[in-house]
């Protein structure tokens, strides 16, 4: 059974319930809804299918809402036709609302003319077209074409190494987040996060609605990389979004940045997802390239908690085959992981002094030393199982919670099998309930050795949630 989790993107393919069923049966842990495309009716329809699939399979697949984010795009063109840009020609970007042609096009960000200056590079359509700013005249950004090509309508625009003053959250993002709260999403992945303020703003929205949705920050530009530490500190997790990242910064820098992000997330005990083009050729072909297989494996070796499929499952020709291939790569790679090395890993100074982290580290070491089959982690919030997963035990982690939202959110935690449980009022009741439910569900059997770790409050504070993971007990299942 794989330990690394897999995020699958929903799309036209998953309008077919049978395909979504097959994805959920074959290893999809989180369903990603990309709000850069589609309308609410479309997303709600797929979410309803997902809810049906959860019930049919009794598998708590989580739902992740990926925001569109503050994007810069080109405008419409005359007759809707592409225009050809030639190297060396002059081409103008304008914030005025116009119909574009081979000499000029509209840009949807009204402040771009204030952010750029002569010498800045502007990339269009994933970097296929490159412009250099010659001068700025009012609303007009006059450029020279460095790399030409065919320019279509509404293409993405990147401005490397320039601080863009776009709002952290657009009005569309805010409406989408409200929709996500109402519909019961488990995660929000915030696109184009540049500073921690974006995450704080989203969390403020969620808090005001009493929502327990967790927030994943997508790192995909130079400013986000520069502010990585402060973003990790406030986010619940990070997505290494290599698509726009590979346009905003030199492509050859992406591998070491990916490793750095994964390392820092593991030190901080935060979830990390590696995404974009992992098995991209399987959108068209039934087999991946050797380079793609190696890419997935290396992300697992780096210590990622999850890997993600995008177009492969959303609209590719082989959605289920792509998932099965990713599962097989992950399982094969995990067979060669040195689990003992993780017990010597570096953690942040804050976590080094953290009681929960110390108890979880001791639980993993104990499970290894006595050859325990399971580490059982009852938790209201899923915090205990998250801390355990970062120590990468060879033993199976069973996360248990009375919260159905927490159970689904644990689906993104490395190595954690989430199971719903009754709430307990005492330590003995907690342990007895956990073992009873796991035995009745044939998850554990008589003779199994298990380490149980949890956060327990005193009797006087029994109606409060535990503030920390603070107990460990070893049990032999009767």
Tell what function each PLM region has:
Residues 1-478:
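Non-catalytic helical/linker scaffolds that mediate oligomerization, partner binding
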């Amino acid at each position: 059974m794989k330990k690394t989790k897999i995020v699958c993107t929903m799309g036209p393919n998953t309008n077919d319930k049978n395909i979504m069923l097959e994805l959920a049966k074959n290893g999809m842990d989180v369903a990603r809804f990309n709000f850069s495309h589609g309308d609410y009716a479309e997303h709600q329809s797929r979410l309803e299918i997902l809810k049906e699939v959860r019930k049919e399979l009794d598998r708590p697949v989580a739902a992740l809402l990926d925001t569109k984010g503050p994007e810069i795009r080109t405008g419409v063109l005359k007759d809707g036709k592409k225009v050809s840009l030639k190297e060396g020609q002059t081409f103008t970007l304008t914030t005025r609302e116009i119909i574009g042609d081979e000499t000029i096009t509209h840009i949807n960000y009204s402040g771009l003319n204030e952010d750029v200056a002569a010498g800045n590079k502007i990339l269009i359509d994933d970097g296929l077209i490159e412009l250099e700013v010659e001068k700025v005249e009012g609303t007009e950004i006059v450029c020279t074409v460095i790399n030409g090509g065919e320019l279509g309508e509404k293409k993405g625009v990147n401005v490397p190494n320039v601080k863009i003053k776009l709002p952290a959250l657009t009005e569309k993002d805010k409406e989408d987040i409200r929709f996500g709260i109402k519909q019961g999403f488990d995660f929000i992945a915030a696109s184009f996060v540049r500073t921690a303020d974006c995450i704080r703003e989203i969390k403020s929205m969620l808090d005001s609605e009493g929502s327990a949705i967790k927030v994943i920050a997508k790192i995909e530009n130079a400013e986000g990389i520069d502010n990585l530490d402060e973003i990790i500190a406030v986010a619940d997790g990070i997505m290494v979004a290599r698509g726009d990242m590979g346009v905003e910064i030199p492509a050859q820098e992406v591998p070491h940045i990916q490793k750095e992000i994964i390392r820092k997330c593991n030190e901080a005990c935060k979830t990390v997802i590696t995404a974009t083009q992992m098995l991209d050729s399987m959108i068209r072909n039934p087999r991946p390239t050797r380079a793609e297989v190696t890419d997935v494996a290396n992300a697992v070796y780096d210590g990622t908690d999850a890997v993600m499929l995008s177009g492969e499952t959303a609209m590719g020709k082989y959605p289920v085959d792509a998932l099965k291939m990713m599962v097989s790569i992950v399982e094969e790679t995990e067979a060669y992981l040195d689990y003992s090395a993780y017990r010597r890993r570096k953690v942040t100074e804050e976590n080094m002094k953290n009681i929960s982290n110390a108890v979880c580290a001791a639980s993993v070491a104990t499970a290894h030393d006595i050859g325990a089959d399971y580490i059982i982690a009852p938790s209201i919030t899923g915090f205990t199982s998250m801390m355990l997963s970062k120590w990468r035990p060879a033993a199976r982690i069973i996360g248990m919670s009375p919260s159905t939202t927490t159970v689904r959110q644990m689906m993104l935690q490395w190595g954690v099998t989430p199971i719903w449980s009754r709430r307990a009022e005492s330590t003995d009741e907690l342990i007895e309930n956990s073992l009873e439910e796991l035995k009745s569900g044939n998850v554990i059997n008589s003779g199994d050795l298990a380490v149980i770790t949890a956060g327990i409050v005193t009797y006087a504070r029994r109606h409060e949630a535990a503030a920390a993971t603070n107990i460990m007990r070893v049990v032999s299942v009767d």
